């Protein structure tokens, strides 16, 4: 079966409305099946863990990749805790519990998260519930 041909797409992250989870985390969906119009596209989220906060963590049914854009923090991977910093890529296999901790820093920890299936992302579901779609610009209500 031939894949649906898509036009090139550019997304300005600064113009994507964040979904805010309390004071600790902001999530911006910057690429997904709804934006591109094709179900098999890689999902990309821009996340910011605010300085002084930690996230609860989860284990997913799909592999996930973190690319640390900036900042420093800790990442729990099952029973191991590693230091994370800008420029680092972390592969998180399916079933691995992972949690980001930015409590020891005075700067935000910014990451890109990549995964295959949009159905395995809690923030995606929260966006649909709140906005009726996965992506909003800052110019929308």
Which residues are covered by each model-predicted region?
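A short, N-terminal "cap"/entry segment at the start of jelly-roll beta-barrel domains
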Residues: 1-41, 127-141
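Glycine-centered loop/turn positions within well-structured domains
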Residues: 63, 82, 98
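Conserved short histidine dyad/triad with adjacent acidic residue
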Residues: 28-33, 44-60
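Glycine- and acidic-residue-biased ligand/ion/polar-headgroup-sensing regions
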Residues: 63-64, 68-73
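Short acidic-glycine-tyrosine-enriched beta hairpin
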Residues: 79-95
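Short beta-strand His + acidic residue motifs that chelate non-heme Fe in jelly-roll/DSBH
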Residues: 56-57, 75-76, 92, 98-105
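A short hydrophobic beta-strand segment most commonly corresponding to one strand
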Residues: 91, 106-124
